[in-house]
Amino acid sequence: VAATTATVLLLGETGTGKELVARGIHELSPRATGPFIRVNCGALSESLLESELFGHVKGAFTSAHENRTGRFEAAHGGTIFLDEIGEMPLSMQVKLLRAVQEREVREVGSELSTKIDVRIIAATNKDLGEAVKNGSFRNDLYYRISVVPLFIPPLRDRQEDIPVIADHVLESCSSKLNK
């Protein structure tokens, strides 16, 4: 999977290590020297998410005091990890679909589009197939992001991974604390 440019959808319960898998795919890919940009799609309001993903120009809205590059542009040449994509509002899904299909983004408040070269890895703990059926997730976007679906089993079913994950967490915390 890492050697391809295919869009990947990571499926699994909260806490299964989906971000760790996404980082691993990125680090083993030809895009490893490019940025790995994470966006939690469920943590932001719709308007903030749009600005976060696509950027905005000065004056686009009340608090837009300066131009801001979006996460898609920041990930150019690398990978964007769209965590909790199942939480994204339908109106934002349309905008994301356009970015995925056209390989370009438009900053909020701008008429100009910018070409992007990013690999997309998305993750969810929801059953997106069911979400498509009940109308809370777009069918066309689902098929665009699930080119390579990977199910990550819960940690309780793969206890042999616990020491590896614990080492990673300790190393990560230690480097953040400069120890």
Task: Locate the predicted segments by residue.
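ABC-type ATPase nucleotide-binding domain
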Residues: R23, R144, V148
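AAA+ ATPase active-site-proximal loops
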Residues: V1-K115, I120-K126, A131, L155, ...
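Conserved AAA+ ATPase "SRH/arginine-finger" region at the nucleotide-binding site
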Residues: N40, V148-D161
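Charged helix-capping and loop-helix junction motifs
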Residues: N134-F137
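Conserved Sensor-2/SRH helix of P-loop NTPases
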Residues: I162, A166, L170
